[in-house]
Amino acid sequence: MATAYAGDNDATGALPSVSALLRAFRSTTPPPGDHPVLEAARQLVHCHELRRHAYREAQAPKASSARVAGASRLVDHIDRERTRLVDCIDVWVADNIAHREGASLHTETLGAVIDRMAGKWVAAHHALGLPASNHPTDELPASTPDGEAHLHWVRLAELADGYKDLITDIAEHRRRLPVF
């Protein structure tokens, strides 16, 4: 397996930096030669946007039972796609990141961490009435920042800090990721 260094952003066996991950969340089109983890992360944001929209449709006033059932089926489909994308990230990690025996084991796979960050990215943007990516799924009303929006952004910042610490610990062989 290849040696990884935190902050490298190419597809040569290194984990993407937190800034590259956040840029991928915002972008809808991958740059040429984009890292496979970033492409999956970009798609996870889109899944979370679609999921949020489906829930809004199902919870709309006077939503018919057919509409609610359709939204439920759509959420199931989206969740299967999220699982596939998380698995793609985890397979890439297993194939490309050196795992040092004896290093502390992290409790989540990298795919699960990135999926959680993508979900919080979408929630934080929607709390401000902003689209989560450059390709919004629907128009959002402008909103005034409130305590809920602040909480989402603080939590996203905490997740970003945790991701940065995790990839640094992996690169320095202090932590290893579970391989499923």
Name each region found by the language model.
Residues 1-180:
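Anionic, Ser/Thr-rich low-complexity intrinsically disordered regions
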